[in-house]
Amino acid sequence: MSLEVNITKKLDGFILHANFAARSTATAILGASGCGKSMTLRCIAGIVKPDAGRIVLDGRVLFDSAQHIDLPPQQRGVGLLFQNYALFPNMTVEQNVLCGLKAEKDKAARKARCAEMLQAMRLESLAKRYPAQLSGGQQQRTALARILVGRPKILMLDEPFSALDSYLREEVEGEVGSLLAGFGGTVLLVTHNRDEAYRLCRDMIVMDGGQVLRTGGTKEVFADPQSTTAARLTGCKNILSCTRVDAHTVRLTGWDAPLRLAAEVPETCTAVGIRAHDFAPCAPAAPNALPVQLNSTSENPFDWNLIFTAPDGTTRLWWKVSKTNLTAASPEAPAFLGTAPQNIMPLG
């Protein structure tokens, strides 16, 4: 299975231009709220009509404005789990799942397929319960079963964990991760949570303001986001202005110090990204050594955040230090921090 999307849609405040391809794996669409992620899913599902463009799923045209093709949602083979999914409260789990088989007219076939899905989603013992009698995780499994029972060619999840309490989120995420791994087709997962995207998806699409900024393998995008916006969305705390010196050297604003990069520095480079865990104390003469002055310290359950300022007193630099145990003391603030050339990401 593969998905090709190239559409435009005028929205309030910006024009959505979604142009990407997704293969038969789980692909995250990462972006801030209101950037067009969810609208992209609705256009693929046929709920919203794009102004122009083309959508092709596994060689089958779902939408083509030039050829006046616009298949209705029920003919697209698309399964979409909304952020605020709703189960029918007056129906049992089994009855809710059967709603996903309305196109199947054979009653015996419907019953057999429903039983198969209840078993696959570990809902057999809950089949006669009503939604109000289920936990949040059980409700979500039921909603997914209702979608999957119809054997969609593509599965799309819109912020599937946002409504769950934090203690439940990891449990449900693990269950969904196993489901995605066994789906066998294209999966699109819309999220603004970089950790969810990293754990669950092999590929990633980064969006901002209706535009696709970056596509590629998830680890590849994290290692080389290419733009300052994509770097921020993937959690990079240190985005430092710079000027290009040569193909592998920049000069940092605020430090007036050179940094050597392993990656080639493009002519368009205006900043570099360094992740907060990638710094380490170093000697003044060490390569890529930066003089720093401690500004503040904060403690998390499993790490410390140390925020420094540059010699100019304005530029901030984050250093995250993992704890060896919960009672570990705050690390001593160094006078110099350094990082390896391969940890520095050129950004445009």
Predicted features, each with a name:
Residues A28, D70-P72, R76-A86, L188:
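ABC nucleotide-binding domain signature
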Residues G77-G79, N90-T229:
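ABC ATPase nucleotide-binding domains
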Residues F222-D246, G273:
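C-terminal boundary and immediately downstream tail of ABC-type ATPase nucleotide-binding domains
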Residues S38-L41, R141-T142:
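ABC ATPase nucleotide-binding domain helices that frame the ATP-binding cleft
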Residues R42-C43, D203:
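The short alpha-helix immediately C-terminal to the Walker A/P-loop
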Residues R54-R76:
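ABC ATPase NBD Q-loop/coupling interface
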Residues V48-K49, V56, K102, A181:
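A position-specific signal in ABC ATPase nucleotide-binding domains
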Residues V5-A26, L30-A32, S38-M39, G46-K49, ...:
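Non-catalytic connector elements of ABC transporters
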